C-alpha cells in the first residue's frame, strides 16, 4: 500500500501543485495492472502542515505499519524525527519530490537543479538590461533550501560574470497585502530595470505590482512556474519569460521510482533524480496549454 502526501491543488497551492498531482495520477493510470493500492492525502497549509488532517492520517498509517511506501515533498517537517525513524525501521520506502531532506533518508528524491534555475534567470536578465540597472528579486523563504539555492545560483552567475547591478531582495513567500505592498515599493524605485521571482506566488505579486506602478512591459520580467495567470501575463507582455520547474515530471518520475522499487525491487540508479527545467517564451507558450506539457516534459 502506497500513500501520496502533497499540498492540495486549491487556494495558493493551485499555482504549482496541480501538474505534480497530474504526473502522479497519469503514471498510476498507465500502471493499473500493477498490484499497487495508492491513496491520496493532501494538506492546505504549505507553511505548517503538521496538524492538518491529511498529515495526521498518514502519521496514523505509519504508526500502525499499514504503509509500504510514501511519496511526499521534501522541504517540510510534516512528521517528527521519531516518526520518520519508525518508518525507516519498518522498511517504509520514502520518495521525496521537490527537494531532498537527508535527515529523512529517502529512497530517492526527484527535483530540478535549483542553482541552474537561478543561473538561468540571471543570464536572461543580465543579457537584457544595462550594467547600472537594478533588479527586484522575489527570493522566497530563505529557510527553504530550494528557494535559497535559486538565489545562490543567481548570485553565483553575477559574481562569475562581473555583474555589479544592485539587487533588491524581497523574502515574501505567500501572497498577502503586506507582501504586495513591499514588492510594489521596490518596483517603484526609479533604477529598477528588471525583476524576477523564484516562486509562483512571488510571480503573481510581481505581475500585479508591475501593473499597479505602470511599469508593465517596461521592465524586463521573469516569472516562475507555468500556470494560467503567468501564461496570461506572458502573452500580455508583462512577463518576458517564465522558468518552470517541471512539477509534472517530478510527480510522474517520483511515483514511478517508488512503485518500481516496491513491485519490481528496482532501486533508483541515483539518490537524486534531476528533472529538466525550461524557459518559456511567448513563441513556445502554446506548448504548455491544454495538457500539451504531459508529453513535452518527460
Map each language-model feature to its residues.
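Hinge/cleft segment of the Venus flytrap/periplasmic-binding protein
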Residues: 142, 158-161, 246-298
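Hinge/beta->alpha junction and helix N-cap segments in small-molecule ligand-binding domains
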Residues: 7-19, 39-55, 75-76, 110-120, ...
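Hydrophobic alpha-helical
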Residues: 55-89, 153-154, 166-233
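Signal peptide-proximal N-terminal region
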Residues: 25-39
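Anion (oxyanion) recognition and catalysis
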Residues: 29, 86-89, 159
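Flexible loop/hinge segments that line or gate small-molecule binding clefts
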Residues: 75-116, 227-240
